């Protein structure tokens, strides 16, 4: 897939590149295009805690980065949660306001907002999890090296040559994906498909009739293999 240049209009508020499966995207090309079009970037690093692109941690490559702490992620908070990072003070204040119902001061609300405050117990769990993040990510990299050594045809999705993936998912791509998954199931080996139904195929968007053949082909051929740090 790629960015449709003809689809860029004044209605576009931001470009959101995704570091999918924990693998950094080709951020320089996104940044170059965004700067040319004067469009801000919001990084989706929800699957990429600790991933690196050109010696910088993802989530810090643009003004705003977003992380998820959902229980299946490389780092969690003992429940659902998330984090937004920014190096811009004005943006930081807006985010703090929006997460607290649009609050400006104790008794003033100057924008619409939401209740998205992370409680202190979840935050404390997250701080402990953070200490172990690098070690767990290293274990994921050990696991993928074993897969690569034992699987043929380079079927594991490649790592960005300018980055360091944290392998939130270890994903193979193969035309016979469904046959492979059936064989794994028959041998009591778990697997998963992300994402079987793409955004433009969801009922909420299907009326627009988008056709994205590259994304659709990719979706038909990818399969996530077991990849958690305690895998033996």
How would you describe each model-predicted region?
Residues 1-77, 83-85:
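Active-site phosphate-binding strand-loop segment of PLP-dependent enzymes
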Residues 2-7, 14-18, 23, 27-29, ...:
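PLP-dependent aminotransferase class I/II
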Residues 79-80, 127:
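Amphipathic alpha-helical segments within well-ordered protein domains
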């Amino acid at each position: 897939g790629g960015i449709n240049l003809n689809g860029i209009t004044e209605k576009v508020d931001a470009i959101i590149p995704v570091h999918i499966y924990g693998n950094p995207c080709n951020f320089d090309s996104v940044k170059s295009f965004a700067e040319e079009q004067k469009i801000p970037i919001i990084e989706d690093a929800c699957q990429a805690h600790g991933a690196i692109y050109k010696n910088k941690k993802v989530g810090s490559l643009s003004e705003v980065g977003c992380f998820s702490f959902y229980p299946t992620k490389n780092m969690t908070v003992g429940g659902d949660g998330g984090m937004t990072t920014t190096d811009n003070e004005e943006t930081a204040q807006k985010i703090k306001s929006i997460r607290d119902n649009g609050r400006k001061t104790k008794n003033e609300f100057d924008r619409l907002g939401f209740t998205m405050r992370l409680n202190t117990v979840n935050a404390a769990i997250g701080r402990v999890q953070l200490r172990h993040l690098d070690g767990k990510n290293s274990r994921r990299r050990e696991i993928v090296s074993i897969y690569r050594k034992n699987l043929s045809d380079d079927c594991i999705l490649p790592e960005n040559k300018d980055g360091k993936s944290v392998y939130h998912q270890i994903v193979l791509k193969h035309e016979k994906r469904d046959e492979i998954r059936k064989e794994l199931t028959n041998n009591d080996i778990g697997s998963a498909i992300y994402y079987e139904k793409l955004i433009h195929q969801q009922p909420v968007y299907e009326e627009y009739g988008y056709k994205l053949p590259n994304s659709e082909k990719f979706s038909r051929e990818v399969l996530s293999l077991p990849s958690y740090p305690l895998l033996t």
